[in-house]
Amino acid sequence: MKGIFNAKIAAEFTPPKTWVLQKPLSFSTRLLAKNEVNLLRQIGVNVSSHKSLVMGKVTCVEGMQTDLASVPRIVWAVISPWDVARAAVIHDHLYASLRKYFHSFNSRKSEWRRARKLSDNIFLWGMQSAEP
């Protein structure tokens, strides 16, 4: 397991395709290096680290809007969006922070690529840690 979620998703559907978190959702992993935690903080991600545990925790706040996993229905037999929904919510938070930061500060493309790759890795670790 690459990490652990704090809870199951508690979200309310708001048409046409948005869900609103009813309580915070976190993903903790030991795979984040200190410089990666710092990069996530820099772009505005709600991330904390625990020195004693050498662990990073990304948290989505209550009220955050998400589309969950935008998985086409035809692919559900292979990858159900419900199996990876928590990872998708974390990924949505990461990408929303990423877009907001880079549109506001026009940062270098190398930072953008590094932050995007890290966000995608966290999504992958979350999917690998998913339980239906």
List each language-model region with its residue ranges.
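Extended terminal accessory/targeting regions
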Residues: 1-132
